[in-house]
């Protein structure tokens, strides 16, 4: 038995098996492993010299040569009965880094083949200051295997083929898509129960338009996910000028718009260098988001247009509004603005996030929008590192709204520069005035086991309007390193 296992482990080397990462034939067999196993059982049972009856996905990617098909079958199912696996690569951190190519076909279909992709925990390099702060805690989320939902599977490698695949396929593999300028990857017409898998590197032509949305997604019972080694590259460096959505050249304001999405999942995506806000999530119910890596590290550096400031600005990770029963978990964000910002919605859980370099975990700003009610939001088991704020609730002056039942629990802060806990009701035109108003009611707010350190600023800052704040509870809260704390509510003062 041991001898058989040992031989099996050396079989790929002995056969000279190609890597699925670099060879389209091996990749096609790896991606469609179930179909490959069925085909190879027949193909290797007898001597076959013709290419008739071979599934198109294998034929086209194996150069229409029976010897390539035979070799791929021989290499299928080695040590563990699955296709030979290659070492997973970390997400690319620059636009010049290409990642695992998927099958080089334009729009290949196979019927009723659930496709499974495997991903594992990976790391990307942090800046020196981040590594010094919490190197051991900067592990990226493990990304679990995913599967399609049956039905027709389409592999798309050309932007022009996306719309037809969305209309006719229940499983869609978007492989190394290059979306031309002013061309949205439109996933709003997905079939109920559809699955979309991003593979390779997804790129976009430069579009200097604040109303342009590079990716738009909607649907019911939909799964959006990513294959091992993929990256969705927003090409933010082409737009960054230190001003974000506050001025400068026009740039896409929202990179990925998720709207009208019900009972669906977004998981295991690697997103790099988005221009301004990354996710705009609106009008969803029972949406689950998990295992995402949002890496805007490159935006920390100044460029020729940013006048010495970080080039990226207003790069919120997740902006959530008018959404109910949403769960966001197990994700990693390095950006230059809010890690998460909830401006309206109910029954929202944000759990196990790692937030670096931005403005923390936020409610708001509330007021002056079409919907100004937040009810039932929990931030839990998360870290906010080297950011301006830790936990923040803010409302706009001279507006109305409600913020009810918000809990921050088991939150660790480190290297916070402005406010550890911050509740303000004095925002006007995007800035604080120091004069709070009471049109937005903030009630039933709790902080439980929120601890950490400041690099500067105030540990606690609470500025409520007259009578507009009530029932704040602080349990096991301990933030140190700041100075000049100021709290006008509760009457007992700061924690």
UniProtKB/Swiss-Prot annotation:
EC numbers on record: 3.2.1.15
Disulfide cross-links: 154-169, 339-355, 464-469, 487-494
Enzyme class: hydrolase
Signal peptide limits: 1-16
Entry annotated with the keyword Repeat: yes
InterPro entries given in the database record: Glyco_hydro_28, Glycosyl_hydrlase_28, PbH1, Pectin_lyas_fold, Pectin_lyase_fold/virulence
Recorded catalytic activity of this chain's protein: (1,4-alpha-D-galacturonosyl)n+m + H2O = (1,4-alpha-D-galacturonosyl)n + (1,4-alpha-D-galacturonosyl)m
GO molecular function: polygalacturonase activity
Gene Ontology process terms (BP): cell wall organization; pectin catabolic process
Start and stop residues of the PbH1 repeats: 261-283, 284-322, 323-344, 374-395, 403-425, 469-492
Tagged with keyword Membrane: no
Listed GO CC annotations: extracellular region
Purpose of the protein: Involved in maceration and soft-rotting of plant tissue. Hydrolyzes the 1,4-alpha glycosidic bonds of de-esterified pectate in the smooth region of the plant cell wall.
Recorded family membership: Belongs to the glycosyl hydrolase 28 family.
Name listed for the protein in its UniProt record: Probable endopolygalacturonase D
Organism: Aspergillus niger (strain ATCC MYA-4892 / CBS 513.88 / FGSC A1513)
Lineage start: Eukaryota, Fungi, Dikarya, Ascomycota, Pezizomycotina
């Amino acid at each position: 038995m041991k001898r058989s296992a040992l031989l099996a482990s050396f079989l790929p080397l002995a056969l000279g098996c190609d890597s699925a990462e670099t060879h389209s034939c091996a990749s096609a067999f790896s991606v469609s492993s179930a179909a490959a196993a069925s085909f190879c059982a027949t193909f290797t049972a007898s001597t076959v010299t013709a290419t008739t009856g071979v599934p198109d996905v294998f034929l086209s990617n194996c150069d229409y040569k029976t010897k390539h098909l035979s070799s791929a079958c021989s290499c299928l199912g080695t040590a563990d009965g699955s296709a030979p696996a290659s070492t997973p690569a970390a997400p690319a951190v620059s636009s010049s880094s290409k990642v695992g190519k998927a099958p080089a076909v334009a729009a290949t279909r196979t019927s009723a083949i659930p496709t499974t992709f495997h991903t594992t925990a990976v790391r990307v390099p942090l800046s020196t200051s981040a590594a010094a702060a919490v190197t051991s805690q900067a592990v990226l989320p493990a990304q679990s295997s995913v599967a399609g939902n049956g039905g027709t599977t389409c592999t798309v490698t050309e932007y022009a083929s996306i719309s037809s695949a969305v209309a006719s396929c229940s499983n869609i593999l978007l492989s190394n898509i290059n979306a031309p300028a002013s061309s949205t990857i439109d996933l709003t017409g997905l079939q109920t129960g559809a699955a979309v898998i991003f593979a390779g590197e997804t790129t976009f032509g430069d579009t200097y338009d604040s109303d342009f949305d590079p990716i738009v997604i909607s649907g019911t019972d939909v799964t959006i996910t990513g294959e091992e080694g993929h990256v969705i590259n927003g090409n933010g460096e082409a737009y960054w000028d230190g001003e974000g959505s506050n001025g400068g050249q026009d740039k896409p304001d929202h990179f990925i718009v998720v709207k009208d999405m019900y009972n669906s999942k977004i998981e295991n995506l690697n997103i790099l260098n988005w221009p301004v806000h990354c996710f705009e999530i609106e009008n969803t119910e029972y949406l689950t988001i998990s295992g995402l890596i949002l890496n805007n590290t490159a935006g920390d550096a100044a460029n020729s247009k940013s006048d010495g400031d970080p080039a990226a600005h207003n790069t919120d990770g997740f902006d959530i509004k008018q959404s109910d029963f949403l769960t966001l978990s197990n994700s990693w964000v390095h950006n230059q603005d809010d890690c998460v910002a909830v401006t309206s919605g109910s029954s929202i859980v944000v759990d196990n996030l790692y937030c670096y370099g931005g403005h923390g975990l936020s409610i708001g700003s509330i007021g002056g929008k079409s919907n100004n009610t937040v009810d039932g939001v929990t931030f839990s088991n998360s870290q906010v590192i080297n950011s301006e704020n830790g936990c923040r609730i803010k409302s706009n002056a001279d507006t109305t709204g409600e913020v009810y039942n918000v809990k921050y629990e088991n939150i660790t802060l480190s290297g916070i520069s402005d406010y550890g806990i911050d509740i303000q009701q004095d925002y006007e035109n995007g800035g604080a005035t120091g004069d709070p108003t009471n049109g937005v009611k903030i009630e039933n707010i709790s902080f439980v086991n929120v601890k950490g350190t400041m690099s500067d600023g105030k540990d606690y800052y609470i500025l409520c309007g007259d009578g507009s704040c009530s029932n704040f509870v602080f349990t096991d809260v301990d933030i140190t390193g700041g100075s000049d704390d100021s709290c006008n509510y509760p009457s007992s003062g700061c924690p």
